[in-house]
Amino acid sequence: MLEKFISFLKENDWKIEENGTECDVYSNEVLSAYEPLPAAFLEFIQKFKSVISGDEKRFFFCVDDYSGESGLAFKWNEFELISLEAANGDEDWTNDIRSWWKTKIPFYMSVDGEYSFYAIDMDDNGSILSGYEPEFEEADKVADSFEDFMSKVLSGDIVL
């Protein structure tokens, strides 16, 4: 499935750089907090160093992005940070935001017009959520797993 997914992205002008070295995902402080990660997602982030659309407005996060070492302009938790800023110090709202994001791991971000993301919901057996600005936390389930997500992208049910 992963190879078909990557072929599809390449055919649609995505720039993909493979990771030349084996990496221990769980040595990454951010990723280790979500252990165990779904196998298909783990394979994806271990295999690739960067996966970015041709216009550079949409991208999948890879291991270096979660550690802040990739040089990407946006942080992996950018939308959580935006929400926290919007909470403007309101303690209850801030706690709600942090609680919601604690079990969600964003793996895709779009800054093409409306900001949006896809994330793995660790509270729901690794299902995939889709969220948009301005209320990122009002996300909807769009796939049962990362593998299902890739399948839906290939079939056109999910458009990146």
Describe the residue ranges of each PLM region.
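A surface-exposed partner-binding patch
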Residues: 1-112
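Surface-exposed beta-strand edges and flanking loops
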Residues: 18, 63, 119-122, 130
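Generic macromolecular interface patches on structured domains
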Residues: 51, 159-160
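Short, solvent-exposed coil/turn segments at beta-strand boundaries
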Residues: 102, 122-127
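Structured loops at beta-to-helix junctions and adjacent beta-edge loops in soluble globular domains
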Residues: 108-110, 121-123, 133
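Short, surface-exposed coil-to-beta transition loops
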Residues: 112-118
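Glycine-rich, aromatic-bearing surface loops/beta-hairpins
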Residues: 117, 130-159
